[in-house]
Amino acid sequence: MYCVLMKQESIGFDNRWIRGGKKVNQRERKKRTAKTESAVKTVEKAETVKVEQTKKAVVKAAKAEKVYNTRFEKKLDELRWLYMELYGNSSMFAELCDQMHRFYEERTDVLKKLDSKREADPDWYKKNDMLGMMFYIDNFAGNMKGVESKIDYLEKNNVNYIHLMPFLDTPKGRSDGGYAVADFRKVQENLGTMDELEELTGACHEKGISVCMDFVMNHTSEDHEWAKKARQGDGEYMSRYFFYDNSYIPSLYEKTVPQVFPTTAPGNFTWLPEIGHYVMTTFYPYQWDLNYRNPRVFNEMMYNFLFLANKGIDIIRIDAVPYIWKELNTSCRNLPQVHTIVRMMRLISEIVCPGILLLGEVVMEPEKVVPYFGTVEKPECHMLYNVTTMATTWHTVATRDVSLLKKQLDIVNGLPKDYVFLNYLRCHDDIGWGLDYATLKQEGIEERSHKKYLNDYFQGYTGESNSRGVLYNEDPVTGDARFCGTTASMCGIEKAGFEKDKAAMKRAIQMDVMLHAYMFMQSGIPVLYSGDEIGQVNDYSYKNDPDKVQDSRYIHRGAMHWDLAARADDPKTVEGQLFGQLDKLEKIRKKEKAFMTNADTWTVETWDNSILCIGRYYDGDKIYGLFNFSEYDKTAWINERDGLYKDLITGQEMEAAGVNIPAYGFYWLKKK
């Protein structure tokens, strides 16, 4: 009965009991088949995508390899010739080439793209919007992360190039302000990490800001791994420095090599009693000079250079360039081999990381500075500091006489336009009075007495001075010394603020702004020192710090006062007046094409020793800058009668002839 019923039910209901099961199974099989086919398609699609990605990666790698090979083949012959001339070691050269390729492969796609962009526009850093700012990371914002959080402030300052003062690992109390490096691949722990450096450079690049750092090539800290092994008597590492087991060779060097710090670190060698050897220490006893006669030293330092470049650094400041090659019976300064090394460094960077710029620190007279540009055909440094012009500017402030400054600018303006100087009023270092004393002597001014006058003036010891500051590394025998102080303090802002003298403050601010306006008119790239934009004065707290008290340069290395920076938008404050006027100058400079770095630049006779006139011309635009370095109103007796000019600051129209200029005043006159 059950079977019959089921049969009837199955007949009555389309055989669902018997055939329905088959239908369910068929549907399930179809679903499973569909899922399988879908999964297969997904896998096939993923494999296709993977294959395509692999193909793209292969094509991309091949393209990158082709780019590298093109650069390498173009530079190889000269690089090999220079290397073999200096070292004659083919195996070390082969190693160098292998490592260059490795560092190129490790360079990120973002940096490679930036390299290509800059290769296509080699004058990218010569634009009229290029404005730098230098600062110590801890003083400015505490650490790397802090700097990253202040990028908006940098943009507010119209800055698109920052120089991070030395931040690599150094021993506490023996750092020379960061220039005694113990590890070239480690950031000082209190400042951050290499990863955070890379994050900072990446964040800066997103905002169009280039990043500069110091690369100390001449020496390492005595705490460097090499120095530690050398101190243990390891010959391999001793050969990376200059070691001597008696005083004979050191005494020969001392006959011809000048002392850098005759009072604080006399001599050029330090005795190490634990190993019974002398080691060369041109700067401080804890900074051991590297021996670049050893190709291992050159190679390893280039690897450090490329490592840092791959962290996103755009500008490498080569510290103490003239000192890096040593020869007996010479001054060990500016020797030909130095130029060979810098040229090789330029070639290496153009192969591996052509977006990098080399900035040379050559604190010497102009005729010794200029050769570090190399030649137009075989360039060395992209940029050099305009050190002598900076010192001559402050000489002009103290004497109210622009004659020497005009001559100095004429020398700079007469150089090829490919040569780019970094112009600044103040930096982290002292001011050494390395002026053109041969010219001054023709005016009856003697070097020794004039240096004393300048140091007295800027310390505020002369009646006509409103400056404040201190001496550095004074030599009691010769009376020679260098000077330290911030721009604002040297202009009189510190004194006027202390004395609550409103008239003096107005005059000091006017001088400060005039000097910046003059700096912006020079041929080259202007660089601000952090704090100058708000008129920070000398910081005397260093005298209470046992690690700093012996180094008076810390007077102008004070921490950034963010409470003062908060007043930058208030025109009633000193900070607001300075910031607002500098901001206006910077924006005008960015707008006017006559401020391009490679514009024609020249000086014009004003027939008044207190007034400087600088002319600039580019692509049909002409601007004259007139600057009064005197506390009295003056007249510039220029006679440019080719039509009306417009002052870019006030909008006033006038002829560029017989121009009256107020005390510490200036004009930027553009031909209409």
Q: What is each residue range found by the language model?
A:
Residues Y2, K7-K672:
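Active-site and adjacent substrate-binding regions of carbohydrate-active enzymes
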